[in-house]
Each structure stands twice: as structure tokens, then as C-alpha cells.
């Protein structure tokens, strides 16, 4: 899980989701997991 100021999709399978007011990227590739800090 990377915590970044700006999250974006890395591949076409990444999905942007809002959880508890935070933007999260979930993807089958675990290296692409991100969260907005």
C-alpha cells in the first residue's frame, strides 16, 4: 500500500474507490494498491 498525495490508475485493471472519505486504488496487482494521504 503506497500512500500518496495524488493517486491514479497505473494499469487498466486498477479501480478507484472512495472509502471513509479517502480515495483508494484496488487492483489484482498488489503493487498498485494506493491510498490518498
UniProtKB/Swiss-Prot annotation:
Any GO MF annotation of the entry: structural constituent of ribosome
Principal location class: plastid
Xref: NCBIfam families: rpmJ_bact
One Pfam family of this chain: Ribosomal_L36
Subcellular location, record wording: Plastid, Chloroplast
Protein name as catalogued: Large ribosomal subunit protein bL36c
UniProt keyword annotation of Plastid present: yes
Protein family per UniProt: Belongs to the bacterial ribosomal protein bL36 family.
GO cellular component, one term: ribonucleoprotein complex
PANTHER family: 50S RIBOSOMAL PROTEIN L36, CHLOROPLASTIC, LARGE RIBOSOMAL SUBUNIT PROTEIN BL36C
InterPro entries: Ribosomal_bL36, Ribosomal_bL36_sp
Signal peptide: none
Amino acid at each position: 500500500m503506497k500512500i500518496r498525495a495524488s493517486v491514479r490508475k497505473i494499469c487498466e485493471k486498477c479501480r478507484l474507490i472512495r472509502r471513509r472519505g479517502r480515495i483508494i486504488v484496488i487492483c489484482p496487482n498488489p503493487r498498485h494498491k494506493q491510498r490518498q494521504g
